[in-house]
Design a protein with these regions (language model features):
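Intrinsically disordered, low-complexity regulatory regions of eukaryotic regulatory proteins
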Residues: 5, 23, 27-28, 103, ...
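An amphipathic alpha-helix/helix-turn recognition signal
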Residues: 7, 35, 70, 74, ...
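N-terminal Rossmann-like dinucleotide-binding module
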Residues: 11-83
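Beta-loop-alpha module in the N-terminal Rossmann-like domain of NAD(P)-dependent dehydrogenases
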Residues: 88-147
Length: 149
């Protein structure tokens, strides 16, 4: 793989986040020791497929457990690669059903910038932790709404 400096920096930051978050959880929960953080990936574009998903799969502290995509076939292909069960593949229309999926601890939002606020807020309402790509939102109002969740 031929990486430029920008891609290397992004991949390094995401890998660090993917491995650090479960340690924070484990420090606060005696029952979490040795448990992997279970990720739902929202958006199957280049950033998530080329960087975040491989980093989580390679980590000792993370596991991919759900996918959200507007393209079912693409999601099924990725699910097969990462052993994500078919019932844990969601469309944008069925996204709110993640609330019932106890195999998702948090979601990684890798959607177009204009969609960050909506899907972050919906995940928070579903009781899921959120890691959102940058920029957080496209307006101050959206950012505030995300923070206030």
């Amino acid at each position: 793989m031929n990486l430029n400096r920008r891609d290397f920096s992004r991949l390094s930051a995401m890998a660090a986040m993917a491995t650090a978050l479960p340690r924070v959880d484990a420090q606060n929960d005696e029952n979490a020791a040795g448990r992997k953080l279970r990720w739902g990936i929202v958006g199957l574009g280049r950033i998530s497929m080329d960087h975040f998903m491989p980093a989580v799969a390679a980590s000792k502290t993370g596991k991919l457990t759900a996918l959200v995509s507007g393209h079912r076939e693409k999601a099924e292909k990725q699910a097969a690669m990462y052993n994500v069960p078919s019932p844990s593949i969601y469309s944008y229309e069925t996204y709110d059903e993640i609330a019932q999926n106890k195999e998702i601890d948090g979601v990684y939002i890798a959607l177009p910038n204009s969609m960050h606020a909506e899907y972050t807020i919906r995940a928070a309402k579903a009781g899921k932790h959120v890691l959102c790509e940058k920029p957080m939102a496209t307006s101050v109002a959206d950012s505030k709404a995300m923070i206030d969740m």
